[in-house]
Amino acid sequence: MTAPGFTVSAFILLLHVSFVANYPSGKVTKSCGGMIPEHGHTPQSHPAHNISVSQKTFRPGDQIKVTLSGPPFKGFLLEARDAENLSGPPVGSFTLIDSHVSQLLTCEDVQGSAVSHRSPSKKTEIKVFWDAPSGAPNHITFLATVVEKYKIYWVKIPGPVISQPNVPPFTTPEATIAPMPTVPSVSHLTRSFNASDCGNKKFCIRSPLNCDPEKERACVLLSFTRDDQSVMVEMSGPSKGYLSVAFSHDRWMGDDDAYVCILEDQIVHIQPSHLTGRSHPIMDFGDPLEDMAWRLVDGVMQCSFRRNITLPGVKNRFDLNASYYIFVADGAAVDGRIHKHSQQPLITYEKYNVTGDPKNIGGSHSLLLLKVHGALMFVAWMTTVSVGVLIARFFKPVWSKALFGDAAWFQVHRTLMLTTSALTFIAFLLPFIYRGGWNWHAGYHPYLGFIVMVLAVLQLLLAAFRPPLHDPRRQMFNWTHWSMGTAARIIAVAAMFLGMDLPGLNLPGPWKTYAMIGFVAWHVGTEIILEIHAYRLSRKVEILDDDRIQILQSFTAAEAEGYVFKKVVLAIYVCGNLTFLTMFLSAINRL
């Protein structure tokens, strides 16, 4: 397996397998040899595009204009080959005429030996120069693969043959037609899968745990039933576009044995594939899957197939007598093309042997480190920092008595803020441990988190050098401390809003957004109430100046009344705050 530099979320993100859609920049070097897009569809048999050349003879060093034209197409791959050995490597190199629509590729370690599209925009004509190399074969032909759209493409469209002067005439080599792979028959399921035998006769993975696909449309079921030397696999879930399962040696993407059921034009295609490191999954053909069947009813897609437990000599297929982590995913697909998933795949907590004793298990859509990261950030920036701010802002006169050498309010405030910083630091490290580095696929969330971490550290340093109460610099400290703290809280809330939608911790919605808005309103409302109360309380104080003697009206009763009110508001606020926090922590725990 590959190193954990790329999260398991890529399992479905990289199932977006399209010669054009997966490679919008035209970087299709991996297809140089066979010139075959990995679409999982049969190429068209009658070319609709044409290759023409500016001359029919050449000498080493000549430049020959090559034109590919025809109906609008999105992607292409153009190469020159030895006309007498079409399976050989590309010959010579190309020079671009319009670098805005085409680009050079390096095939077989020869720079510029192929040309491809630069973008998936539609085009009707491509012109390039082919540079004849020294030692070129006697006869050269040009081959092009053209992609009109995902499932409509032509492979190795032949162009004219050009020859060097004074060489034996070109004779077309005897055609060798490769046998077409046998297409297994696919039938329709007559009834829905059921989960009654899970844990008894079937090895089942379900999400939510113990759900029933016959009663719940959202239920995702994966079951394995051993039958002598083969295993029957069943998948059921919402008909968003595809269902997939993969067997993995660890919890990271790479070198995995995968199977995908893809909905296209109200037909379900069952396709084996394999994953290779960080590259796109490769659809496999001719694999010995048997008894394939599918069903599409009431928004639920179901598919099944049988495969032998051991497949000696078949590349990329795992021995199912061993134990593996199991990935289960579903998502959208358009025209047979799998799209980026919105949620992490369900991953079993440990390795299992699906052909062993029947079990009924679940899994998690989020790995433990990411769940702990989210939980710690919620505790820190929803609860500890919020309560700490209220204490410092409104409760100085309420808890002014000394506690361990300092005012009680200050001790509580300092403890809560140190806790916030400690939780933030721990939570900040966890994604780096999980991914082995910076996450470049999480949008603005990690950048906002980094800013929050920096501000939290600066706040600690600033607080450590707090000037004495009557020092002239104290007012500047107060404003700086307040400004940085307020900025950190606002940015932290924004980071939490964004983090809730990331695939690694995709909390179910839309309640999460409303709950976060509710928390913000709850906190802001509490601050407004305490501000109004403080203002009204100050109005009760009347200072009279008579012969330089200040007479303070009796304030003891009003002061006591104000303290009680503040304590009641704080108690209610903490209860509400903990309610919001519990909602989010419970949602994380259920992932």
Curated annotation (Swiss-Prot):
It is an enzyme of class 1 (oxidoreductase). Residues 13-179 form the Reelin domain. One of its GO terms (cellular component) is membrane. InterPro entries: Cyt_b561/ferric_Rdtase_TM (IPR006593), DOMON_domain (IPR005018), Ferric-chelate_Red/DefProt (IPR051237), Reeler_dom (IPR002861), Reeler_sf (IPR042307). Its cofactor is heme b. The keyword Iron applies. The chain crosses the membrane at residues 6-26, 372-392, 416-436, 445-465, 490-510, 514-534, 568-588. One of its GO terms (biological process) is intracellular iron ion homeostasis. This is Ferric-chelate reductase 1. Gene3D superfamilies: 1.20.120.1770, Reeler domain (2.60.40.4060). It is found in: Membrane. Keywords: Electron transport, Glycoprotein, Heme, Iron, Membrane, Metal-binding, Oxidoreductase, Transmembrane, Transmembrane helix, Transport. Glycans are attached at residues 50, 85, 308, 321, 353. Ferric-chelate reductases reduce Fe(3+) to Fe(2+) before its transport from the endosome to the cytoplasm.
